[in-house]
């Protein structure tokens, strides 16, 4: 019997100050009692380059749960509606 608890994966969200979808994504994660690390790409050019390399996208937000690239706000909501986001947030996906 395996008694090792699955650790919740770290959530990293790449954002900018003027992004309304970033605010919506943060509000949604807050409603799910999640914590995340916010990386502001408008303040850090190196972080923007890293996001573009990892996500292969230039828009924000870009959301990562552990090693999984969720995508933007609409992508996260599609996962939620499909019942696949919560297991990912819990570390079970």
Task: Label the model's feature ranges.
Residues 53-59:
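Thiol/disulfide oxidoreductase modules built on the thioredoxin-like
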Residues 2-35:
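Local sequence-structure signature of Cys/Sec-based thiol-disulfide redox active-site neighborhoods
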Residues 35-48:
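Thiol-based oxidoreductase modules, predominantly thioredoxin-like and allied folds used
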Residues 20, 45-46, 71:
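Short alpha-helical
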Residues 65-93:
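Non-catalytic, surface beta->alpha helical segment in thiol-disulfide oxidoreductase systems
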Residues 2, 48-52:
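Short secondary-structure transition/capping segments
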Residues 2-5, 61, 77:
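Short secondary-structure boundary/capping segments
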